[in-house]
């Protein structure tokens, strides 16, 4: 499974666009929702994050060592889950968190939460722009020449800076929001948010430091979101939806098993 080509192009356009803020992104035959955050409220990734690691430094050497470990997972169940996590198109992207939440996340069952996740994806994606444009860090597959979990996406990814990871930023944004919506499931959804970012290292498309700093940026996005009345109102409604929600219709056993093995 890969991200749909039209969505990849649109996602990269969002990340590289000069039009930042609560605007509706459109193109490739699709209209995607506006985010909650106006441009002045977006976290400044250049101020918040350290410069991307440079070659020969301890940070880069650690990234390379962790990349080598991740490459050994090709063909495993964890690699297959990482391939699923690469898909940022909906409904698949939201459903990746259904098992951890214990509730089916869908346009039909939890419409406000579903839309909230789509809109906050826009906010999280926009927040990475300044650092991505500044550092233009090359991705692991461009350096090591090894395969990724989504080969059809490589042409798009080559032109989009690796640092910080947009997927990790988005996944951690979602995890923090879902933990607030369902405190009783907070450990599970935070673990899923962490594994969502780790999947990018396993896919050979991001370095570990890209993912780590993406999580910090995701936390900054959520902090900013709490200054927006519309977001807080939708968050309250989403809590009601989840409280009354239905268990996921899919079998969560395989995902749970894969992540349990990965943790140990």
Feature map (PLM): residue ranges:
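Short alpha-helical patches at coil-to-helix transitions and adjacent helical residues
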Residues: 5, 167-172, 211-218
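Bacterial N-terminal signal peptides that target proteins for export
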Residues: 1-8
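Bacterial N-terminal signal peptides
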Residues: 9-17
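Hydrophobic alpha-helical bundle signature of multipass membrane enzymes
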Residues: 23-202, 227-230, 234, 242-245, ...
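Interfacial helix-loop-helix junctions of multi-pass membrane proteins
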Residues: 195-226
């Amino acid at each position: 499974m890969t991200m749909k080509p039209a969505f990849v192009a649109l996602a990269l356009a969002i990340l590289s666009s000069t039009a930042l803020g609560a605007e509706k992104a459109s193109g490739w035959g699709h209209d995607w929702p506006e985010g909650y955050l106006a441009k002045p409220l977006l976290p400044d990734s250049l101020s918040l994050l350290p410069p991307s690691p440079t070659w020969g430094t301890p940070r880069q050497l650690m990234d390379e060592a962790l990349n080598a470990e991740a490459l050994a997972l090709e063909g495993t169940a964890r690699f297959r889950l990482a391939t699923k996590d690469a898909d940022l198109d909906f409904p698949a992207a939201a459903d990746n968190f259904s098992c951890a939440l214990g509730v089916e996340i869908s346009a039909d069952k939890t419409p406000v939460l579903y839309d909230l996740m789509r809109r906050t994806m826009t906010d999280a994606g926009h927040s990475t722009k300044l650092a991505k444009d500044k550092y233009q860090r090359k991705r692991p597959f461009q350096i090591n020449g090894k395969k990724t979990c989504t080969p059809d996406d490589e042409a798009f990814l080559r032109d989009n800076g690796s640092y910080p990871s947009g997927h990790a930023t988005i996944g951690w944004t979602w995890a923090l929001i879902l933990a607030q919506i369902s405190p009783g499931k907070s450990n599970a959804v935070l673990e899923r948010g962490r594994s969502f970012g780790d999947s990018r290292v396993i896919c050979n498309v991001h370095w570990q430091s890209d993912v780590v700093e993406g999580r910090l940026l995701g936390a900054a996005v959520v902090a900013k979101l709490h200054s927006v009345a519309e977001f807080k109102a939708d968050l309250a409604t989403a809590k009601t939806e989840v409280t009354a929600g239905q268990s996921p219709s899919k079998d969560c056993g395989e995902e749970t098993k894969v992540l349990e093995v990965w943790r140990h």
